Amino acid sequence: LTQDATGTMAYLEFEAMGVPRVKTERSVAYIDHNTLQNGFMNMDDHRFIGSVAKKHGIYFSRPGNGICHQVHLERFGVPGKTLIGSDSHTPTGGGIGMIAIGAGGMDVAVAMGGGTYYITCPKVVKVNLTGKLSPWVAAKDVILEVLRRLSVKGGVGKVIEYCGEGVKTLSVPERATITNMGAELGATSSIFPSDEITLSFLKAQGREDVWTPLAADPDAVYDEEVDINLSELVPMAACPHSPDNVKPCTELEGMKIDQVCIGSCTNSSLLDMLKVAHILKGKTVHPDVQLSIAPGSKQVLNMLAENGALATMIDAGARILESACGPCIGMGQSPNSKGISLRTFNRN
């Protein structure tokens, strides 16, 4: 997996190897980061990446098609497979049962050329989930709780494995939200089992043929264990200037905000968007607040249009952005001077 912020250098390195076609089962080049054309450079990069994809047997996802991790989950994620990507949030794929790792462009180029990707053998941390999320508590609160306990350095050199009865209460998009932000833990990767919920997601995508059940061995030994009762979690938010500076929303209630941005590879699934539409229905965005919403993929955008949720968002006064990374990587929607921005993104 590559994207256009890191892909240009990765493909220059790949072409320098002189390999005629990629030797991976599948390689995908996504254009989702630098999608605002303020000058010729971004478009030149997109044209270059597209030409490399055509020449070397790489799938090409054009601008506006969606955020790489959301689209990859929908179209290409396969339980039990390995994935490396030139993007730190590649572990999103762990939500579908992949070992997905963010890597450098050179490492990804070497892998596409048939070379080996080496990592130091990671420690494995078991996160045992019990109970069920209460109303208004989301999957984001699960990973925020992990960050609160372990810190942004707590996952370095480790793979986070989610287990327990609570796993069965989480959909694939919710699991992907949690594994996505394993990057903020500094983890090598994060992974969920592949079960009937995974199969249901793949059936909805018309890809049930790639499903395989995967779970931890009953006698598996872990380097660390963390227990989280989902029923005890409350709505939380990460405050400036670190994802592990987590506080319950009750401590933030009443704070005046200037901007709300919803989307990114962490929270742009159909499930996330339908929650937003439900909250906005029959309401109007406050005149002093700017609300921007970026669906994670064309698939999500089309489904929102079909079920009326998109109209609900527009009627409420939301600005609908392109299906891309957008404000998360600073591509537009900068807040006002000394403004307070509330975002569903994985970085703050």
Q: PLM ranges: what are they?
A:
Residues L1-N348:
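Fe-S-dependent hydro-lyases/dehydratases of central metabolism
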